[in-house]
C-alpha cells in the first residue's frame, strides 16, 4: 500500500502528523477500554450478589408455595391465580454510563395485584408465599436491569476492542510503512542529488583547471 503514496516532503509531514493523532486516539480508546472493564467488574459483582439473593428468596417462595399447595390443593390455587388479570407494569428509562446508553427499570408498585384470597379462609403458607414473592419482585427487576446494563457495556467494549485491533493491525502499519517508504525515496533522491552535484563540481573543477593552463 505504501507504494501508492506520493513520496513528497509535504506527504511525509502530513503522515507524521496523522500518525501522532492516531496514536493519541488509540491511547484514548485504550483508556476507554480500561474504564469499561472497571464498570463491568463492578456491575458483574453486583449482579452476582443480587442473583444469589434472588435465588435464596425464590427458594423461600417455592417452599411456601409447596406447603400452600399441600394445604389448599393445586386446583384451588390455580383457580385463584387464573382469576387475576396480568397487571404488573414497569417504568423504564435510559441513562448514560461513560457514553454507553443503558436501561433503568423500576417496578410500578401500584400495579402489584392484591391477594385474590382471604388470610382467614386460606392457608397461612399461601399468604406467606404471596408476601415473599412481592418482596422478591424488586430484586428480580434489579437483576434484569443489571443484566441489560452488562450486555450494553460488553457490546461497547467489543466495539472499542475492534477499533483498537483495526488501528494496531491495519491503520498504524499503513502509516508507518508509508512514512518509511517516503523517507527511503526522499533519502535516495537526496543521495542521487548529492552524487550529481559532486559530479558537476568535478566537471566544473576540471574545466577551470583546463582553462588556467
From Swiss-Prot:
According to its record, what are the GO cellular component terms?
plasma membrane; proton-transporting V-type ATPase complex
**Subcellular location, record wording:** Cell membrane
Primary residence = membrane
Gene Ontology BP term (one): proton motive force-driven plasma membrane ATP synthesis
Q: How does it sit in the membrane?
A: Peripheral membrane protein
The GO terms describing molecular function are: ATP binding; proton-transporting ATP synthase activity, rotational mechanism; proton-transporting ATPase activity, rotational mechanism
Q: Which Gene3D superfamilies match?
A: 1.10.287.3240
- What family is reported? Belongs to the V-ATPase D subunit family.
* Descriptive protein name: A-type ATP synthase subunit D
- Record organism: Saccharolobus solfataricus (strain ATCC 35092 / DSM 1617 / JCM 11322 / P2) (Sulfolobus solfataricus)
Amino acid at each position: 500500500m505504501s507504494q501508492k503514496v506520493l513520496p513528497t516532503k509535504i506527504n511525509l509531514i502530513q503522515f507524521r502528523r496523522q500518525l501522532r493523532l492516531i496514536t493519541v486516539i488509540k491511547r484514548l480508546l485504550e483508556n476507554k477500554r480500561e474504564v469499561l472493564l472497571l464498570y463491568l467488574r463492578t456491575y458483574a459483582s453486583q449482579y452476582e450478589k443480587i442473583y444469589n439473593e434472588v435465588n435464596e428468596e425464590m427458594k423461600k417462595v417455592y417452599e411456601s408455595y409447596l406447603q400452600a399447595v399441600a394445604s389448599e390443593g393445586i386446583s384451588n390455587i390455580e383457580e385463584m391465580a387464573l382469576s387475576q388479570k396480568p397487571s404488573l407494569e414497569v417504568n423504564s428509562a435510559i441513562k448514560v454510563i461513560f457514553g454507553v446508553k443503558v436501561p433503568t427499570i423500576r417496578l410500578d408498585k401500584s400495579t402489584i395485584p392484591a391477594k385474590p384470597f382471604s388470610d382467614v379462609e386460606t392457608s397461612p403458607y399461601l399468604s406467606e408465599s404471596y408476601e415473599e414473592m412481592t418482596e422478591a419482585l424488586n430484586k428480580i427487576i434489579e437483576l434484569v436491569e443489571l443484566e441489560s446494563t452488562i450486555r450494553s457495556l460488553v457490546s461497547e467494549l467489543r466495539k472499542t476492542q475492534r477499533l483498537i485491533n483495526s488501528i494496531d493491525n491495519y491503520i498504524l502499519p499503513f502509516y508507518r510503512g508509508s512514512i518509511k517508504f517516503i523517507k527511503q525515496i526522499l533519502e535516495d533522491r537526496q543521495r542521487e542529488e548529492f552524487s550529481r552535484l559532486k559530479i558537476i563540481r568535478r566537471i566544473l573543477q576540471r574545466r577551470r583547471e583546463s582553462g588556467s593552463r
